[in-house]
């Protein structure tokens, strides 16, 4: 992928942040049930991952799409549909690499190295496509969770991670030296989803420990780019997990100060958002892989985004 595409995606996210909007926290509209969200899906129901999640969320929000399903022009045609004239597609990306063989000028020996890069392709929301089978146009399901109760599926998910969580005080944080998450009591939060979204954020931080994912971005004091990068990973990872678990991400009270620190990172490095999304995806996948196995039910979004395959082949 050319650098101008990195610029294009980063600049759009920067514009949203400068407007005070976190693109990964506003992926819903009035047509979605009570603000409940889902990851964007491919034509075969498999979820997108990484940076593609909130790129498609941003496009859905901007265009007012309620349907979460996206597909290529060819996939639409092979399903019997057609993209309406004048509709513009949305860029999604996937990782690829090439292997180069080079000869050492002094020794004459050949050596190989792998060069990673990003490639992109275009998809359309099903609301831009006519004459698809009817089930592609289905609206989001009605909410089934009572907001006044603890959310048992989320409780079970968090318990299965094995993270050490203590309750008390009025701050939420992960303490690496003790490998422990500290949370205010459940009843201190304005609603259950605020509690769980906050705990998911701290649980993503928990994955950085050396005995788990060993994630390190350098300097870790407030205001440092390393600190801001880790917070960005936790923020995006919590948004991914919230979507997987069917809860609405929380807006933190320190919204403005964090946005300022993220803007600094993104403006200094056009690839930083790709790195943050990749680390966030790995953290979410790590936590899903700690869950008890269910027959024939893969963990959401453990599949990396790849190029679109011909119909009849499984997209992964």
What are these regions (language model features)?
Residues 1-316:
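N-terminal accessory/interface modules of nucleic-acid-binding and processing proteins
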């Amino acid at each position: 992928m050319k650098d101008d595409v990195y610029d294009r995606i980063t600049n759009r996210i920067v514009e949203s942040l400068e407007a005070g909007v976190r693109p990964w926290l506003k992926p819903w509209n009035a047509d979605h049930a009570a603000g409940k969200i889902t990851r964007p899906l491919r034509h075969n129901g498999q979820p997108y991952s990484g940076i593609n999640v909130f790129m498609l969320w941003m496009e859905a929000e901007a265009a007012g799409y309620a349907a979460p399903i996206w597909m290529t022009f060819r996939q639409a045609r092979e399903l019997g549909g057609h993209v309406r004239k004048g509709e513009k597609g949305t860029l999604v990306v996937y990782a690829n690499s090439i292997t180069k063989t080079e000869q050492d000028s002094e020794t004459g020996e050949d050596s190989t190295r792998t060069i990673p890069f990003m490639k992109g392709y275009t998809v359309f929301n099903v609301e831009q496509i006519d004459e698809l089978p009817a089930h592609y146009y289905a609206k989001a399901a009605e909410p089934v969770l009572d907001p006044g109760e603890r959310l048992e599926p989320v409780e079970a998910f968090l318990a299965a991670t094995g993270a050490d969580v203590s309750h008390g005080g009025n701050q939420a944080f992960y303490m690496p030296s003790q490998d422990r998450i500290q949370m205010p009591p459940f009843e201190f939060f304005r609603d259950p989803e605020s509690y769980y979204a906050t705990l998911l954020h701290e649980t993503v931080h928990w994955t950085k420990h050396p005995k788990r994912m060993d994630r390190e971005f350098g300097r870790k004091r407030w205001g440092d780019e390393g600190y801001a990068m880790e917070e960005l990973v936790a923020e995006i990872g919590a948004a991914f997990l919230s979507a997987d678990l069917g809860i609405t991400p929380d807006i933190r009270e320190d919204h403005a100060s964090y946005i300022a620190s993220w803007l600094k990172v993104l403006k200094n490095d056009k690839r930083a958002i790709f790195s943050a999304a990749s680390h966030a995806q790995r953290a979410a996948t790590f936590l899903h892989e700690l869950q008890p196995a269910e027959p024939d039910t893969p963990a959401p979004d453990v599949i990396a985004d790849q190029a679109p395959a011909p119909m009849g082949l499984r997209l992964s």
